[in-house]
């Protein structure tokens, strides 16, 4: 079975994605709505999208917002023995998570797969063979960060000039400019 694999991430100019287990910048309402819309919207009636995240990302989400609603939540951890409270599934690696999607309890329920963090999960996905789309919000300034996104290899990934449902013009919120980009690889 072939499921679409996507990463969605917001990066500042220094490729920072986190600081002290939180965003390195103020939350941007329209960027958050974009994240929700992209990761929630299924193209197949009766199916849901699967969001895959690392343990630290899971626990960085405020408890009242866990699990991410209208999505199947899977946490990656080599330490946990069972899914954390609220999570639907647990896997030790991205490969194990992808194998889980072939099992009967998920095979007929999952439409798209969205990797939502953190940095090691993104890196594992970006090095995974096969088709992958990166939905990157480029925050057009630096923020002090302690967690970073890998540089995108433009030899491997092609920046798409446009993508349905993704605004291509510069956005602004809380005096922070940002733009949405979509990159794709197929190896």
UniProtKB/Swiss-Prot annotation:
Substrate binds at residues 31-36, 71. The keyword Plastid does not apply. Residues 4-185 form the DHFR domain. It catalyses: (6S)-5,6,7,8-tetrahydrofolate + NADP(+) = 7,8-dihydrofolate + NADPH + H(+). Its EC number is 1.5.1.3. One of its GO terms (biological process) is dihydrofolate metabolic process. Expressed in numerous cell lines. It is found in: Mitochondrion; Mitochondrion matrix; Mitochondrion inner membrane. One of its GO terms (cellular component) is mitochondrial matrix. Keywords: Membrane, Mitochondrion, Mitochondrion inner membrane, NADP, One-carbon metabolism, Oxidoreductase. This is Dihydrofolate reductase 2, mitochondrial.
């Amino acid at each position: 079975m072939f499921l679409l694999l996507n990463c969605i991430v917001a990066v500042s100019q220094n490729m920072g994605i986190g600081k002290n287990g939180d965003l390195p910048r103020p939350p941007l309402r329209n960027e958050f709505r974009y994240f929700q819309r992209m990761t929630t919207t299924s193209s197949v009636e009766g199916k849901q999208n699967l969001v895959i995240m690392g343990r630290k990302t899971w626990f960085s989400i405020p408890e009242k917002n866990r699990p991410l609603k209208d999505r199947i939540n899977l946490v990656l951890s080599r330490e946990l023995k069972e899914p954390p409270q609220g999570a639907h599934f647990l896997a030790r690696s991205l490969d194990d998570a992808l194998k889980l999607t072939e099992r009967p309890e998920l095979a007929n329920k999952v439409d798209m797969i969205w990797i939502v963090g953190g940095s090691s999960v993104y890196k594992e996905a970006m090095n995974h063979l096969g088709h992958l789309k990166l939905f990157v919000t480029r925050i057009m300034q630096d923020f002090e960060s302690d967690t970073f996104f890998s540089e995108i290899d433009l030899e491997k990934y092609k920046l798409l000039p446009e993508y349905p449902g993704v605004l291509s013009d510069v956005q602004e919120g809380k005096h922070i400019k940002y733009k949405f980009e979509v990159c794709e690889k197929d190896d």
